[in-house]
Structure formats: C-alpha cells, structure tokens
C-alpha cells in the first residue's frame, strides 16, 4: 500500500486504496464515496447489558462524510472566501513547490509550471463548487486539497484533487 503525504507538513493526505487518476501530470484525482460509520459501539465478550440497569450500553455516534476525508483525518478549511484569496495562496504554494522541485527533481520544474497553469485555470473557473481540506495538522502553509462533486450515472460522486508535486509517496 502507498500513502501520499504532504511534503511540507508531513500530513497523510490519501492512499492508493482509492481509485486514483493523474491529470495533466500535476493533479491526482481521487474518487471517494459517502459513508456512515458508527462510533462508540463497543462489544465486550461476556457483557450482558440487559442484566444491568435499564440505561446501559454506550452512546453511539454516527459519523458521516467522504471516506478519504474521514480515513485520513482531513479537515475542511474555510480560509478562502473568494477566488482572489485562493489565487494568492496558490501563488505562494507554487513557489514553495518549485523550490522543492529544483532541489529534488529539477527535470519536473518545466512540466509542473506549464501544466499547472492550464489545470489551475480550469479549477479556478469552478471555484464556487469546491470545498477545501488541509491535512490533520490544519497547516495552510502546506497542501490544501480540493473536493467537488461530479455527476456520474445520475449519482453525485466526491472527487478530491491533490497536487502531485506536493506529495511524497511512502510504501507500506
């Protein structure tokens, strides 16, 4: 299994257990699904709640959301009120990525710059439809992933987008 981590914060962003598609050599599109999970439902062998008082058992909470977000502890951020603030973040973040690429993979710099401009124009055109997520550390200096819902066979499917060059792959 491969885990993809933010190269700036070290936060786990997603794994290869999902359907992953590379777009224009710069964006990973990861297909998620809406899930509901019960938390706090504890089963103990030999424990018979009916033999106790009437108010026994544990409270259970149902957690609902996109599996990628829940499994990798991503946190929704509302840091970008408008397209302009997101564009400012992107310019700063792209500078950080170019510096990292020049250091570790100089052959990728031109590919990144060329293709990222094309991809970001497309993404900025859909800005109002996007949700934004940071890693568990909630550090906006690192990667802010994007999510949108796309209609596939009459069903809304959550698609998360991550910058390929902002991730490091860890094999388990």
Swiss-Prot record:
Gene3D superfamilies: Metal Binding Protein, Guanine Nucleotide Exchange Factor, Chain A (2.170.150.10)
First-listed, main subcellular location of the protein, grouped into a coarse class: cytoplasm
InterPro entries: Mss4-like_sf (IPR011057), Mss4/transl-control_tumour (IPR011323), TCTP (IPR034737), Translation_control_tumour_CS (IPR018103), Translational_control_tumour_p (IPR018105)
GO cellular component: cytoplasm
Subcellular location(s) of the protein: Cytoplasm
All residue ranges annotated as the TCTP domain in the record: 1-172
Cross-referenced PROSITE patterns: TCTP_1, TCTP_2, TCTP_3
Chain segments annotated as coiled-coil in the UniProt record: none
GO terms assigned for molecular function: calcium ion binding
A Pfam family: TCTP
Top-level taxon of origin: Eukaryota
Matching PANTHER family: TRANSLATIONALLY CONTROLLED TUMOR PROTEIN-RELATED, TRANSLATIONALLY-CONTROLLED TUMOR PROTEIN
Function (record text): Involved in calcium binding and microtubule stabilization.
Family: Belongs to the TCTP family.
Name of the protein: Translationally-controlled tumor protein homolog
GN (gene name): Tctp
